Regions:
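Positively charged n-region of N-terminal signal peptides that target proteins for export
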Residues: 1-4
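Generic hydrophobic/packing signal
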Residues: 9, 122, 148-152
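Metal-centered catalytic cores of metalloenzymes
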Residues: 18-72, 76-139, 255, 275-276
Length: 276
């Protein structure tokens, strides 16, 4: 396909996905206020649309302000422009969370078009101290392949929602694993290198035929037990550190399965999830 057509197709696909978005994110800074407030306080928002009733479940976490917060809202306007309040949000002074009223079709269209922002007002900056333009979040995707266990199934990884400094935890799930066994979640920041190893790395050399290592590990995963159906999940803490935004996490499950192969382990496919 010619480069120009490929670029055009990519733009169309991105627009189509945004028009159907159900998960949203924003990073709040003083620089996004109009005019800029000069505040160094940061904030992060995550939000999920309930498509059944058109409500939004939101969570906004902010740092410490010099003066007390007085209000927080969702507004309608493009980046760089001030706009009217659409919905007032509840909570504070550090965490705002709740569920909105049902959105109208026009409000939902504006949200998906990037025409909403969230801001927090303080007594020092009554017009707004920090602001974040809301955009569709990038949801986790799987990659690679796992290897079959003694139950004739291949363990599968999944991610619930997306990792964000505004959320307490990011849930990583496992299905199709050996039942009532031990599962270990590796989580790192690379899918191409694990120390001196180039990934994906063929694990047949250590007795795991058809299995591959798909990510590195920085020690933020852990171990758990699978249930009678071979399922499990791991809550992974994402601390409120806005500097983490933009980092991509890579994960893979390893499951104890003594008769599956010589080493007695199987593993899942990989999960790629961007902190946002």
């Amino acid at each position: 396909m010619p480069r120009s057509l490929l670029t055009f197709a990519t733009i169309l696909l991105a627009g189509a996905l945004a028009a159907q978005a159900t998960h949203f994110t924003a990073t709040l800074t003083g620089a996004q206020e109009v005019p800029p407030s000069g505040s160094t306080t940061l904030g992060q928002m995550s939000m999920i649309l309930d498509t059944g009733n058109s409500t939004l479940a939101y969570r906004v976490v902010v740092g410490k302000f010099a003066t007390a917060p007085t209000a927080a809202h969702f507004h309608r306007a493009a980046a760089g422009v001030n706009g009217p309040v659409v919905i007032a949000i509840t909570g504070g002074p550090s965490i705002y969370s709740g569920i909105t009223r049902a959105l109208t079709a026009a409000e939902l269209a504006d949200l998906r078009a990037g025409l909403w922002y969230v801001n927090v007002h303080t007594s020092q900056f009554p017009g707004g101290e920090i602001r974040g333009q809301i955009s569709a979040a990038t949801l986790p995707v799987t990659y690679g392949a796992g290897c079959m266990g003694s139950n004739a199934k291949i363990p599968a990884i999944s991610g619930r929602d997306f990792p964000s400094p505004s959320n307490a935890v990011f849930q990583v799930g496992l299905t199709n694993a050996k039942e009532s066994s031990i599962a270990v979640l590796l989580m790192g920041v690379s899918k191409t290198q694990y120390g001196a190893l180039v990934l994906p790395f063929d694990l047949s050399i250590i007795g795991m035929p058809t299995c591959k290592a798909l990510c590195d590990d920085i020690g933020i995963g852990g171990s758990t037990a699978t249930d009678a159906n071979g399922a499990a999940f791991m809550p992974v803490l994402i601390p409120f550190q806005p500097a983490l935004v933009g980092i991509t996490l890579y994960s893979q499950w390893y499951v104890v399965d003594p008769v599956a192969n010589l080493l007695g382990l199987t593993n899942s496919n990989g999960l790629e999830a961007k902190i946002q």
